[in-house]
Each structure stands twice: as structure tokens, then as C-alpha cells.
Amino acid sequence: MEKIINQEFGGERPLYCRHDLYLENVKIHAGESALKETGNITAVHCQFEGKYPFWECDGFVIKDSLLTVGARSGLWYSRNCEIYDTIIDAPKTFRRMDGIKLKNVQIPGGTETFWDCRNIVVEDSVIDRADYVFMHCENVKLTNVKLNGNYSFQYAKNVEIRNCVLNSKDSFWEAENVTVIDSVINGCLLYTSPSPRDRSL
């Protein structure tokens, strides 16, 4: 595995389509798609400032790092992602992804985060300002998570929530197969499946 340590990159696609990389103390400055279409990437003590850093990637681990507000829409169309001890300050993270694991992650601005994703595990994390989080997601497991945001889990399927606190009104709209264990939910719950449009008059 190639190591890139104590370096800085910017502009368009500086590490495009690279594989088997270990990044340590690397800064990705303003630009786009720094690691697009990469695979088997490990990033430790890194900072991501440019847009769309991890698009269409397969197999990457992020540890003890920061995705700034500038790294918006940062992780889309990717697979097999693990993130530990990291702050994701970027909006609209995680779209159409398969295989996401988060542990001890802070997401201060989580609005429209986790859309159309599947096979998600989130542990020991905080998701704030997270309206419409987990929309159209499937196979979601949350353990010891605090979530602040309304309209969560719309149209979600196969959701397990354990030891969590959800401050979320109008959650679980049209959701299917939801299990909540040893948790607190503050707000209205809306289970309305099947859809009213499918009911006979």
C-alpha cells in the first residue's frame, strides 16, 4: 500500500482513480472529486475541504479526520465505507451508498444526510440539525446515537434503534419494519403504511 504523509492537494481530482493508498495528515483543499473512483483507501488525521471527495469509491476507512463544510455532498455512490472518531461538518453526506459503518462520529449539520443508502450501522454518534435524515434507507442499525432532526426515517425499511435518543417530530413516515429498543423518541410518530393512495375507497 502506497503511503502519502504530510502532503496537501487541491484542484480537480488530484488522486483520481488511485487504489491501495494510506493517507496520513493529508489536507485536501478547495476543488472537486479528490478521490473519485478510488478503492482500498485509508485516511488518518486528514482534512477534507473540497467538494465531492469520495464519489464512486469502493472500500475506504476514515479515522480521526475532519470533513469541513466545503466538503459538501462528500460521500455519494460509494460502497464499503467505515468512519471512526471523525467530524463530518459537510452537508448532504451519504447518498446512494451500500455498506456504511460509523463509530464515534459527530455530524453537526445532518440535514438531508443518509438518503437512498442501505446496510448502515451507526454507533456512539451524534447527528444534529438533521431534518429528513435516513430517507429511503434500508437495513439501518443505530446504537447509542443521539439524533436531533425532524422527519427522520421517511420511507425507510428494516430499521433497528437501540439505546438511542431521537428528538424528531413526524418520524417514520411510511417506514416499514421498525424496531425500537431501550430508547427515547421525542416527537410524533407517523406509521402510515400502506400508503393512503394504495387504500381502496
Model-predicted regions and their roles:
Residues G11, H29-A30, H45, E49-G50, ...:
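Residues in short coils/turns that link rungs of repeat/solenoid architectures in beta-rich domains
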Residues C17, E37, E56, L67-V69, ...:
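Extracellular beta-strand solenoids
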Residues P53-I100, N104-D116:
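A generic tandem-repeat structural signature
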Residues R95-R96, I100, G109-K141, K146-Y155, ...:
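Solenoidal tandem-repeat scaffolds enriched in leucines and small polar residues
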Residues Y191-D198:
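Conserved small/polar residues in nucleotide/adenosyl-binding loops
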